[in-house]
Design a protein with these regions (language model features):
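Basic, Lys/Arg-enriched alpha-helical interface segments
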Residues: 1-65
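Enriched for short, Lys/Arg-rich terminal
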Residues: 69-102
Length: 102
């Protein structure tokens, strides 16, 4: 089985911090489990990133994908790109109810 290198961009790390801060204000007991669930889901990207759907966002020469991470009654979306050197770059993370990536 092919294994990919995982690269979490600074923007994606900032998204996790933003989501954590929001959840901490809403329900402090959910913040840690939500972020932990997202971080554990990253492991799928190391082994089967092609199993995730293609994102609607497209730029010339780039194919972006989204991983759905279920949590509670909704969940989160992780935007990523598979690089030619077998690296998966996590670009952004958002709640499913957010209109767009930040």
């Amino acid at each position: 089985m092919k294994t990919y290198t995982l690269d979490i961009t600074i923007a994606a790390q900032e998204d996790l911090e933003r989501l954590y801060d929001f959840l901490s204000d809403q329900d402090a007991f959910l913040a840690d489990p939500a972020i932990s669930t997202i971080e554990k889901a990253y492991e799928l990207l190391r082994f089967m990133p092609e199993s995730c759907r293609r994102a609607h966002l497209q730029l010339e020469g780039h194919v972006y994908r989204e991983m759905i991470v279920k949590f509670g009654r909704s969940g989160y979306l992780v935007l990523f790109e598979i690089q030619r050197d077998e690296t998966v770059s996590v670009l952004a993370v958002k709640h499913q109810r957010e209109s767009d990536y930040h």
